[in-house]
């Protein structure tokens, strides 16, 4: 390695270390934020400079009551974290090398995904009822707890359940098969049932404080679309639904990036009655989810306990598919 390359790598590493330290600085340390304003921000889930840097002007203005001041505070936070200017593609590459991955526990699926489920990204799992979406989410909530040498991150998970499909008994089965203490595996999962789309969005906001206080590396929302579809039926409500869903997905993307966690969401499918050739099913949520998710994985049933996983949208993965089995021990090749 040349001396120039070593120097460049050292500079990038030093910059990243400095940014990480500054990111966790208390919000009240920012210029323009006093104790009263700081208390208001913390009440709404903005605890650190990192939280402010990833906020929108509109969100902050609603809290502090002044749009210009909100803009100034956000700019100050982004400047502190080095987010206010361009960086070299080399630095982007070096940052990408530090991305962490959670093994799915299925070797072929990990290979399809380039090593597993990425942090700082939203991975969407699409499929019909019974295709294995929730099973995969359960397995990931266990896999993240394994040490890095076994494909995990030695971390905890947050699980937001919108359809009452979370089963602790299944977690215990998968954990036991992976050599983990089943009770401890359950203890390492923060669970919440979401009863409406509003409640679902509030839980994502509350997840920030849990991530800050605990070693959390995975956030699951299963399913992301269910409440939005039931609460906003018909074409007359579509625009309102999509606007609200857009904010929810944007919040998830910001959370993934700001806290270096893997966000996994499941999505339902819907039929296209005017399609006579090819697959008549398409993911629910329209362009909002299509553009919001970083990676999109489609699961479908095959014979007996076999499922097919296809990656159909990714910034850099080629399209491809693999098969896996659902067993009592979990998902396996």
Swiss-Prot record:
One of its GO terms (molecular function) is ATP hydrolysis activity. Keywords: ATP-binding, DNA damage, DNA recombination, DNA-binding, Nucleotide-binding. It comes from the Archaea. One of its GO terms (biological process) is DNA recombination. InterPro entries: AAA+_ATPase, DNA_recomb/repair_Rad51_C, DNA_recomb/repair_RadA, DNA_recomb/repair_RecA-like, DNA_repair_Rad51/TF_NusA_a-hlx, P-loop_NTPase, RecA_ATP-bd, RecA_monomer-monomer_interface. SMART domains: AAA (SM00382). ATP binds at residues 127-134. The keyword Signal does not apply. PROSITE patterns: RECA_2 (PS50162), RECA_3 (PS50163). It holds the Pfam family Rad51. Signal peptide: none annotated. Belongs to the eukaryotic RecA-like protein family. PANTHER family: MEIOTIC RECOMBINATION PROTEIN DMC1_LIM15 HOMOLOG (PTHR22942:SF30), RECA/RAD51/RADA DNA STRAND-PAIRING FAMILY MEMBER (PTHR22942). Involved in DNA repair and in homologous recombination. Binds and assemble on single-stranded DNA to form a nucleoprotein filament. Hydrolyzes ATP in a ssDNA-dependent manner and promotes DNA strand exchange between homologous DNA molecules. This is DNA repair and recombination protein RadA. It comes from Pyrobaculum aerophilum (strain ATCC 51768 / DSM 7523 / JCM 9630 / CIP 104966 / NBRC 100827 / IM2). The lineage of its organism: Archaea, Thermoproteota, Thermoprotei, Thermoproteales, Thermoproteaceae.
């Amino acid at each position: 390695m040349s001396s120039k390359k070593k120097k460049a790598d050292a500079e990038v590493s030093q910059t990243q270390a400095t940014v990480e330290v500054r990111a966790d600085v208390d919000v009240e340390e920012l210029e323009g934020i006093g104790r009263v304003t700081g208390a208001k921000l913390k009440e709404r889930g903005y605890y650190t400079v990192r939280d402010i840097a990833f906020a929108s002007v509109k969100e902050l203005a609603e809290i502090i009551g002044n749009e210009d001041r909100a803009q100034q505070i956000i700019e100050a936070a982004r400047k502190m974290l080095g987010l206010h200017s361009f960086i070299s593609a080399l630095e982007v590459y070096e940052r990408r090398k530090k991305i962490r991955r959670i093994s799915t526990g299925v070797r072929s699926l990990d290979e399809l995904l380039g090593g597993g489920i990425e942090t700082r990204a939203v991975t969407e799992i699409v499929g019909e009822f019974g295709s294995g979406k929730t099973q995969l989410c359960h397995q990931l909530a266990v896999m993240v707890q394994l040490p890095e040498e076994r494909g995990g991150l030695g971390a905890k998970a947050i699980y937001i359940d919108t359809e009452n499909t979370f089963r602790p008994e299944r977690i215990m089965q998968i954990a036991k098969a992976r050599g983990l203490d089943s009770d401890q595996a359950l203890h390492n999962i923060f669970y919440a049932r979401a009863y409406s789309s509003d409640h679902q969005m509030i839980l994502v906001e509350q997840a920030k404080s849990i991530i800050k206080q605990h070693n959390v590396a995975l956030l699951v929302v299963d399913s992301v679309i269910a409440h939005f579809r039931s609460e906003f039926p018909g074409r007359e409500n579509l625009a309102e639904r999509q606007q609200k869903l857009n904010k929810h997905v944007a919040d998830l993307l910001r959370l993934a990036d700001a806290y270096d966690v893997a966000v996994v969401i499941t999505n339902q499918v819907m039929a296209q009655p005017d399609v006579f050739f090819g697959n008549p099913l398409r993911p629910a949520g329209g362009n909002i989810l299509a553009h919001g998710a970083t990676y999109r994985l489609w699961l479908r049933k095959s014979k007996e306990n076999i499922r097919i996983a296809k990656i159909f949208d990714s910034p850099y993965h080629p399209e491809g598919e693999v098969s896996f089995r659902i067993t009592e021990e979990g998902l396996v090749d």
